[in-house]
Amino acid sequence: YASYVMPHRVVANISYSTDYAKYFGTTVSLSYYGSANGRGNIDYVKNVFGDGAYNYSLIDIPTLEDLQGAEGWGKGNWTFVDFKTKDGEVTYSAAQQCEDFWNYIQNDKYLRKHTGEVATRNGIVAPWRSTFDLKVNQNFYFFTGANHRKHTIQLGVDVENFSNLLNSSWGNAWTINAGDGYGNTIPLNLLNAQAVYTKGEKPQFQFQKNGDNILTETYSRYNSLSSTWSIILSLRYIF
């Protein structure tokens, strides 16, 4: 898929306007915008093909047998390597990485359906986001001159992301976890990438963390101004 392809989008608007008592008028509008927040790749941290481009090699999506064998997690077909301190203390075991990676796969709709395959370019899709915008205009009319020319003073209130005002968990934007800054996620480090390419060595992996936290989902809520509601007040004189 191309990176700009948006799977689905819904746009709707409803508006009601009325004048009353000769000198007043009110317009209320509600707009809805819903869409997935775009697409992204799921890549290896290092390059697999030896062409010098990092973070652009689409991962192989493992099956359960690749991560878990008869003896437990980390005993499957794939080889994972412990995270260790300089003193050799294990901080994130290969077995735990395999279990967490499998849970991560199961939490993503695309990955869950495509185990045992190479990830498709821009195959992962961001969660659906719905936002409502509320606009209220209050008009005050007055008339001047012999011909009773109409003048309007209009007070406006625009509530952007009105849904977030009602509930802080609504209308949030989404950001990709363990991202590379370009909308792609890089959850898997291929430690011996060059040796795999040049010598045919068996790949050795490490499952990355999301900062200091265990990586559990492809996307998480994005705490920024784009996720919060805002109010814009306006004053217009129409003549």
How does the language model describe each region?
Residues 1-2, 180:
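Catalytic cores of eukaryotic secretory-pathway lumenal/extracellular enzymes that build
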Residues 2-7, 124-129, 225-227:
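Short sequence motifs at beta-strands and strand-loop junctions characteristic
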Residues 7-9, 21-25, 37, 150-152, ...:
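Strand-connecting loop/turn motifs
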Residues 13-15, 135-137, 158, 234:
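Outer-membrane beta-barrel architecture
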Residues 18, 32-39, 140, 159-166, ...:
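Transmembrane beta-strands of outer-membrane beta-barrel pores
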Residues 21, 25-146, 154, 179-219:
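Extracytoplasmic gating/loop element in the C-terminal half of outer-membrane beta-barrel translocons
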Residues 40-45, 166-173:
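Short, solvent-exposed loop/turn and secondary-structure capping segments
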Residues 226-239:
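Outer-membrane beta-barrel "beta-signal"
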